[in-house]
Amino acid sequence: MISFVWSSKYPFIAGSGGSETYTAGQIRELLRRGIPARMITIGFGENDGREDFPDIPFLALDNKEQLAELDDTIVYVIYPLEVKTKHQAYAILHCPPPTYQHGDPLYKRAAFEGPRLITASKFAAGIWRRYLKANFAKMPTVYPFADEAFSKVERPERPKHSPAKVLFAGRLIADKGIYTLLASLQFEMLKDVPFRLTVTDAGSNTEEGSIILNMLKTHPKITVVKARKNAQEMAKLMAKHDVVVMPSTNIFWQELFGMVSIESQHAGCRVVASRSGGLPETNIGGVTLIQPDNPKALAAGIAKAIAAGPLSARQRKAASSRFTVQASVDSLLKALGHPEYVRSKRPTHIHKPGSRLFPHLRHFGLSADAPLQLGMELSPVSVRSEATSSAKSARRTVASAGKK
């Protein structure tokens, strides 16, 4: 059993952020493959968000110490907890350091010593190594992904000269650049561009989010809609838009990856994102990178993306082949050393006699069936070594005959 432990001080609520979507999608893919998996929450009881994920098994614990009693492979999500587990534990670090420390009672710096750490991007691995001041050279990266719903959703047809549609789907916190976005609307380069801006209320369950939400509701240029609770509904929302903006700040927060960017491109949208953190790693053909915390640069990026229009069918297809849930879970199983990964990576074919592995055998009087005649196992690994050995033996035989 692979148990994902939600270590956040907030419940596991759908639509609140990428960490929830990332984790739920991986659990679903594991279950689809027949690998037991579940979500564990601590201290919330059954009010932990499970109603948003009816297809995922949940286990509610009263305290972190109960984790020590489980015979599971523990994968902490957000940050590790200071618990001695029965088996090697892992932690997927979804946020940059040291943001966990602020008002989170479960956070302990010492908890990072035991579990094996996994990051969501190459950028994240770098900043965590520097923060922890330890050699984590083998810290693996397990990239997030876009649910298949995003690549499959149909984009509705719109009147040819209708205003472009721009979407901000990040959480309503300053980290995500919502204030930069508001400031960008004041620049002349956008005032003459016909477009409509939609913002979801994701993250409005926090104090900061509720304040921002009230402000947005009074803005004449912004339409506020409910955050979508599942991939299918989110995909439909994105498909109605041409551009998705991700103006994440670089001052007091750094985006480790950016799932929304991947999902948007799979849905056929252009993305305007800050050249910050792990966001550049999300560019699969449809991203315009702009200077972070710069409203004027953001306005120019939005204008450029609107002029380019949504991705073409060909561009969307190419983008959708990258960052899939299958690839993400393959990487996860590899990082966990799970036997399912080992089995799935075993060779499923053998090279036939006379293939390109054996072209040199004919030069030494050996037939194309030489490997079979020599009783060799035809696996990709053994074939090369045995064929090379046979060739060397044949050369020695020829050389010996020449001397005689």
PLM feature spans:
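A charged, aromatic-enriched C-terminal amphipathic alpha-helix characteristic of glycosyltransferases
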Residues: 18, 60, 307-365
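A conserved mid-protein helix/loop that constitutes part of the nucleotide-sugar donor-binding site
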Residues: 21-25, 173-187
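A short, active-site helix/loop in glycosyltransferases that binds the activated sugar's phosphate group
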Residues: 101-103, 113-138, 146-150
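Nucleotide-activated donor-binding/catalytic signature segment of Leloir-type glycosyltransferases, i.e.
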Residues: 209-232
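Nucleotide-sugar-dependent
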Residues: 248-261, 280-281
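Conserved acidic donor-binding segment of nucleotide-sugar-dependent glycosyltransferases
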Residues: 285-295, 303-310
